[in-house]
Amino acid sequence: MDGLGLRCHHVGGEAGGLGKGFYFTMAGMMGGRMQTAARACGVMRAALRASLQYSRDRKVFGQPLLEYPLTLAKLARMAARFSACRQLAFAIARVLDEGGGRMEASLVKLLACRSAEMVTREALQLHGGMGYAEETPVSRYFVDARVLSIFEGAEETLALKVVARSLLEAALKPASRPALSAGT
């Protein structure tokens, strides 16, 4: 590749884009993080639906699993996490469409992926031994949820490098203060 030339009109951003490829790539990561958050919401939805169906059909000690208070509590927590992440993802997507929300895209990815892990774990618990069997969809949802935390920036990298840094920068900005009049 030594001596390989590239004309300016082939460079992203033309001549103004020289040396900025990394920044162009990083700007594209926000969309990828939103897509990953959306995938996490899809996994949560599928796990919740499968759990509701299984809880209706599965009988334990003569009654449907759905009639046990602990099952209802698990399903309620699963639904709450799914709903919250879905609504947040929609809200942040609108902000991104308007040109903002870089840190927020990382936040929603963090929250949705972690929530997908929790929701699919609860789905596995509700399905018992059947949930762990590789041929069941719930087992696949659990595996899919785990890998989502790695896509588009590992959880720890996002938390430290993107979210914490953005929060720290915002906290350290001097607050705007009204100008003092000459008499005070």
PLM segments and residue spans:
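Alpha-helical scaffold segments that form or flank carboxylate-/histidine-based iron centers
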Residues: 66-78, 102-111, 139, 144
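Glycine-rich beta->alpha junctions and the first turn(s) of the following alpha-helix
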Residues: 1-83, 148, 170-184
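Hydrophobic, well-ordered secondary-structure elements that form the walls
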Residues: 44, 75, 85, 112, ...
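Short, conserved micro-motifs enriched in small and acidic residues
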Residues: 31-38, 102-106, 110, 153-157
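Glycine-rich phosphate/cofactor-binding loops in nucleotide/flavin-utilizing enzymes
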Residues: 27, 127-184
